[in-house]
């Protein structure tokens, strides 16, 4: 297993876009989570491919009727509700990859294999995006107005002095704050999520 992970890490280092292929019929392993963390740390565009979807059995799930009352029932594995629930479980295991699209596939039956390449092209396009300066300024004003920056250490509320894009592939942005203030890491994460939108 260590040799396999070593090869995966070497391949990840050379890649811009990575397909994290998981067996949908098996629990997520510690090694899967470690690879997911490595992807995040190395700023790789990631697509989570849930393979072997044909082996996932229909499962008893609590269904909610339109009036909000819960009732038991058999949930179809191809229903949106079941897939959304499955996605939430995946994101709970990979919280650092909550930006990555998830696709349900089966290499054996060819189920939705054709949808992988459009996701790769989209990831490539987004990775090479340069946001025009005027759009970035508008985005920045809107985001700061909606959610004021939260302070990290200290008593002073942080003032963001500037926000601009340094480069693309991967897109890298710089936020400068006023001297002797600090910004909470959760606000940086918030800005990151808003940029992805």
Where are these regions (language model features)?
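C-terminal-of-GTPase-core extension/linker across diverse P-loop GTPases
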Residues: 1-10, 14-20, 26-197
């Amino acid at each position: 297993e260590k040799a396999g992970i070593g090869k995966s890490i070497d391949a990840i280092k050379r890649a811009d876009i990575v397909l994290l292929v998981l067996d949908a019929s098996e629990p997520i392993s510690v090694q899967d989570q470690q690879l997911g963390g490595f992807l995040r740390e190395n700023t790789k565009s990631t697509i989570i491919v849930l393979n072997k979807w044909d082996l996932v059995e229909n499962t008893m799930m609590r269904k909610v009727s339109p009036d909000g009352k819960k009732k038991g029932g058999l949930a179809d594995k191809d229903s949106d509700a079941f897939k959304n629930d499955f996605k939430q479980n995946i994101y709970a295991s990979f919280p650092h990859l909550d930006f990555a699209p998830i696709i349900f596939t089966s290499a054996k039956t060819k189920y939705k294999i054709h949808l992988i390449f459009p996701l790769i092209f989209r990831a490539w396009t987004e990775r090479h995006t340069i946001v025009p300066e005027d759009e970035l300024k508008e985005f920045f004003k809107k985001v700061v107005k909606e959610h004021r920056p939260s302070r990290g250490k200290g008593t002073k509320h942080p003032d963001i002095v500037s926000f601009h894009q340094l480069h693309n592939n991967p897109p890298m942005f710089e936020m400068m704050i006023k001297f002797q203030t600090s910004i909470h890491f959760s606000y940086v994460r918030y800005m990151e999520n808003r940029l992805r939108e």
